[in-house]
Design a protein with these regions (language model features):
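Thiol-/selenol-based redox modules, centered on thioredoxin-like
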Residues: 127, 132-159
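Intrinsically disordered, low-complexity Ser/Thr- and acidic-rich flexible linkers and loops
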Residues: 72-79
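Short beta-strand segments
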Residues: 46, 81-86
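Short, internal strand/loop/helix patches
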Residues: 26, 83, 95-131, 135
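Conserved redox-active cysteine motifs that mediate thiol-disulfide chemistry
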Residues: 39-40, 47-68
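N-terminal "domain-start" segment that seeds a small globular fold
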Residues: 2-36, 158
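Alpha/beta-hydrolase fold active-site loops
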Residues: 42-43, 80, 128
Length: 159
C-alpha cells in the first residue's frame, strides 16, 4: 500500500486524494484521447506550453523519467504514462515543441490557452503544473518535477 503525498506547490489546484476529472482531448494527430483509456496505469498529467521557458527546461528530465519508468509496475498501477496537456493557442508551435523536446508520449491540447476547459477543471493557474494519478484515476501527488518525480515513482515502484 502507498500513501498520498502533496509537495509544496505554487499551483493551488485540485487536492491530493480527489478523483481526477475525466476528459477527452485531441492529440497531435487529431485523434481523441480519453483519460479513461489510461486506467490501470500510473499517469502524470503534465500541464505545459511551448512558450513556457520553465516547462521547456523541464523537458529533458521528463523524457528521462518516462524512459526509465514507462514499463515498470507500481503500487496502484502497472506502467507509467504521461499525458502532456499544452496550454497553447498556436497549435503549430505546440506540435513543433513536442517534436523538438522529444515527447514520445500522449500530447493533447484544446488550443485555447487559459480559456481551455481542462485548465478550469484541473484548477491550473500557473505553469508548469502536474498531477500524478493512480491506476483508478485518483490524484496521489501533484507538482512533482525533476528529482522529486523520480523519487516519488521510485517509492511506489513494486520491488
Amino acid at each position: 500500500m502507498f500513501t498520498a503525498v502533496a509537495f509544496k506547490s505554487n499551483n493551488g489546484g485540485l487536492p491530493v486524494g480527489k478523483q481526477a476529472p475525466s476528459f477527452v482531448l485531441i492529440d497531435t494527430k487529431g485523434i481523441p484521447t480519453k483519460l479513461y483509456d489510461f486506467r490501470g496505469k500510473i499517469v502524470l498529467i503534465d500541464f505545459w506550453a511551448s512558450w513556457c521557458k520553465q516547462c521547456r527546461m523541464e523537458s529533458p528530465k521528463l523524457v528521462k523519467t518516462y524512459q526509465k519508468y514507462q514499463n515498470m509496475d507500481f503500487e496502484g498501477g502497472s506502467g507509467f504514462e504521461i499525458i502532456s496537456i499544452a496550454m497553447d493557442d498556436n497549435l503549430d508551435d505546440w506540435r513543433d515543441a513536442v517534436v523538438q523536446d522529444g515527447y514520445t508520449w500522449t500530447n493533447v491540447s484544446e488550443g485555447k490557452k487559459w480559456d481551455a476547459e481542462i485548465a478550469k477543471d484541473y484548477q491550473v493557474s500557473s505553469l508548469p503544473a502536474n498531477y500524478l494519478l493512480d491506476g483508478n484515476g485518483k490524484i496521489i501527488a501533484k507538482d512533482l518535477r525533476g528529482l522529486m518525480l523520480d523519487s516519488y515513482l521510485a517509492t511506489i515502484r513494486k520491488k
